[in-house]
């Protein structure tokens, strides 16, 4: 790894739990393929992507896609520097040059014409042709990992040509064992009774969301971990869960439903 990008070697906060998925992703990347992680909220897509970059010892480039993402945001744009017009390199350009792992976050949020600039980068050509500048060859270690939530508000259907350039891994929903492992890793001193109740609460919400009884807003693993963290600071469990999970529903009827589910686990 080159000296100027060593600060991009980031150790993930948490390991990824899920041997089979991890093996599939590692083998795919070793064979020179790019990976697309598809799954609903709280399935660990970004955690897996960060862990893969760390395991391979490559710099990480996080590229968040949104409706206004265009090719200049990915590859770069002209800028004025030292009385000259120069190319300000975008994250995809840098990732390709330094052999990084580009995490294309919420890849289905961008317009398809913006993402089409990646086509030559992701297939057998492995080049980026920058108009008015050089053609750059992809570093042999460079890989791209896309993440997406299918069917969420603001998302679009992915272009078939783009999907064909990825190996797609469907991330399974969290199980009780995985959830317990995550909580124990984050909070080693957590009591078994509390562990059971928090895991149970999250799984109850996950089941309700899968059956379309509630939205996915309260299905928030980051929120649950933050709530446990706040409890360590002395806030009551009810108030902490309200901040981390319940209050993320702004619809009053749904919030009451979530409060009832929470009440069965944390009286």
Model-assigned labels for residue ranges:
Residues 1-203, 210, 236, 264-267:
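AAA+ P-loop NTPase catalytic core and its hallmark functional loops
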Residues 191, 207-214, 236-239, 252-253, ...:
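Residue-level signal for secondary-structure boundary elements
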Residues 199-202, 216-218, 259-262:
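Juxtamembrane/interface motifs at transmembrane-helix termini
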Residues 8-9, 237-267:
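C-terminal engagement/docking regions of AAA+ P-loop ATPases
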Residues 46, 223, 243-246:
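Small/polar glycine-rich anion-binding or flexible loop at a beta-alpha turn
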Residues 169, 214, 232, 247-248:
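A short, ordered amphipathic alpha-helix with a cationic face
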Residues 214-226:
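The conserved phosphate-sensing helix
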Residues 29, 203-206, 225-232:
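Short, amphipathic alpha-helical segments that act as regulatory/interfacial helices
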């Amino acid at each position: 790894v080159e000296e100027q990008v060593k600060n991009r070697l980031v150790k993930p906060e948490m390991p990824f739990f899920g041997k089979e998925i991890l093996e599939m992703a590692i083998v795919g990347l070793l064979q020179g393929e790019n990976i697309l992680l598809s799954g609903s909220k709280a399935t660990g897509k970004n955690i897996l992507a960060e862990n893969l970059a760390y395991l391979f010892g490559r710099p990480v480039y996080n590229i968040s896609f949104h409706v206004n993402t265009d090719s200049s945001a990915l590859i770069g744009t002209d800028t004025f520097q030292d009385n000259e017009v120069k190319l300000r390199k975008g994250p995809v350009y840098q990732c390709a040059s330094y052999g990084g792992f580009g995490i294309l976050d919420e890849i289905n949020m961008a317009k398809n014409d913006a993402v089409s600039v990646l086509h030559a980068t992701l297939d057998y050509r492995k080049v980026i042709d920058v108009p008015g500048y050089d053609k750059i060859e992809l570093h042999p270690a460079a890989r791209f990992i896309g993440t997406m939530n299918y069917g969420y508000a603001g998302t679009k259907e992915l272009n078939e040509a783009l999907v064909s350039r990825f190996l797609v891994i469907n991330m399974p929903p969290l199980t009780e064992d995985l959830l317990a492992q995550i909580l124990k890793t984050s909070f080693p001193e957590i009591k078994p009774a509390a562990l059971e109740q928090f895991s149970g609460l999250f799984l109850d919400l996950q089941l309700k969301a899968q059956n379309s009884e509630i939205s996915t807003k309260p299905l928030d693993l980051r929120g649950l971990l933050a709530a446990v963290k706040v409890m360590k600071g002395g806030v009551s469990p009810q108030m902490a869960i309200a901040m981390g999970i319940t209050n993320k529903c702004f619809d009053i009827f749904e919030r009451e439903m979530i409060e009832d589910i929470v009440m069965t686990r944390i009286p």
